[in-house]
Design a protein with these regions (language model features):
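Active-site and adjacent substrate-binding regions of carbohydrate-active enzymes
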Residues: 1-404
Length: 404
């Protein structure tokens, strides 16, 4: 069918059960010690005031070696030390192992965080979100050594090969994207400015969507990069139709088609997340037993401790990562036809009314629209390779552009 395979590479961190980490924590003299960031504490406290994406503190104390290790995500996800050439060699060897077996490209997880400020100063740029801890964006994102790491990765793994590289770039902006995208670095980046338009000061805080900000953001990225990665959702984002509060039966299909047409006719490569082509919606979470995402669970526990459970549940239902991780809705059979066993996470209860089998028979369905839209992109030279020109609309609520 002409399919190609792009493989996800998570090389910012490993599991705390990985052999490297087990060896690293076995002794301060282990040859794997510097595969991770280990630092002594300040008395009984961690090395600095950094928070992580998922926990109040970005450091975890190890009772074996009496030091702290850095984890920018969950405490069971210790960060790899990209300063160590041996770590980079291990990563390049692994990537080449897959490329040599025919993988057509790589999607690199949180690529913007590979380089850290290894002086580990206290974070001050943001306000404290968790009991005095501060997220250290100024010390972990887009650090000076990052472009050099990506050039080295390109030279060791990708140069001279017909392979694509896409970086998931947390905190990327139109101002810094070109420091990691280019002929000798990455081909594309996933940027999240469109995803974050509905956020307040932090992810969980609601904020009304602004069509003017939407148009400004789209046009800025179309100008900033010659080629963009176009997407409405992934495994970390809520479902697109729910994000824009269009999940009612009357609006869902129309909204899903509108979002697809608005984004996937832009200049760039469309990336579709499973279920998007059906207009799948968020899950109506109401109990902790339904949650699997460590970020959502940590957020719920923190807010419960501060008597803000209602705020937490509103945030989880609207923005929690589990919304995108419910099983694909294939048909009306039990578990939406996804499995004859028990799925790891519950199936959205709306699957009898929203599934692939029904939409495949309906020429007016969201699925049918996606098929026509992608066929149009394939057949139209203007949509495949043409330029982007924003058009002035007679009213603010209209987003219009021209491809030629």
């Amino acid at each position: 069918r002409g399919l190609r395979l792009v493989m996800d590479m998570v090389v910012n961190h490993t599991s705390d059960e990985h052999p490297w980490f087990l060896a690293s924590r076995s002794s301060r003299n282990s040859p794997y010690r510097d595969y991770y960031y280990w630092r002594p504490g300040k008395g009984d406290n961690p090395p600095n005031n950094w928070s992580s994406f998922f926990t109040p503190c970005a450091w975890k104390y190890d009772t074996i070696t009496k030091e702290w290790y850095l984890h920018c995500f969950g405490e069971n996800q210790p960060d790899l030390n990209w300063e160590n050439p041996a770590v980079r060699e291990e990563i390049y060897r692994m990537i080449n192992w897959w490329l040599d077996r025919g993988v057509d490209g790589i999607r690199i997880d949180v690529v913007s965080l590979f380089a850290k400020n290894i002086d580990f100063p206290n974070a001050t740029l943001r306000t404290s979100n968790y009991d005095g801890y501060v997220f250290p964006i100024e010390h972990i994102a887009f650090q000076p050594k990052l472009p050099g790491y990506l050039r080295e990765l390109n030279a060791r793994c990708l140069a001279g090969k017909d392979r694509v590289s896409i970086g998931e770039a947390t905190f990327v902006t139109t101002g810094n994207a070109n420091t990691i995208v280019g002929e000798d670095m990455l081909d594309m980046v996933f940027q999240f400015e469109l995803m974050e338009l509905g956020n307040g000061e932090e992810k969980w805080e609601p904020h009304p969507y602004d069509i003017a900000a939407f148009k400004k953001t789209v046009c800025a990225w179309q100008r900033a990069l010659d080629w963009n990665a176009l997407f409405w959702g992934n495994h970390d984002q809520p479902r697109a139709v729910s994000r824009f509060q269009c999940e009612t039966p009357e609006l869902r299909a129309r909204c899903a088609k509108m979002l697809a047409g608005a984004l996937y006719c832009l200049r760039g490569t469309p990336f579709l997340y499973q279920g998007e082509e059906l207009g799948m919606t968020n899950y109506p979470f109401s109990h902790e037993s339904e949650l699997r995402d460590i970020e959502s669970i940590a957020f719920l526990h923190y807010e419960q401790q501060h008597d803000n459970a209602a705020y937490a549940w509103n945030g989880i239902r609207s923005k929690g990562r589990d919304n995108a991780r419910t099983p694909m809705q294939w048909n009306v059979e039990p578990h939406a036809g996804f499995t004859c066993g028990t799925p790891w996470i519950p199936v959205n209860p709306n699957y009898p009314q929203l599934n692939a089998e029904q939409q495949a028979r309906d020429p007016a369905s969201v699925l049918a629209f996606y098929r026509r839209l992608l066929a149009l992109r394939q057949s139209s030279e203007a949509l495949r390779d043409g330029s982007f020109l924003p058009l002035h609309a007679p009213c603010d609520e209209v987003f219009a552009y021209e491809r030629r």
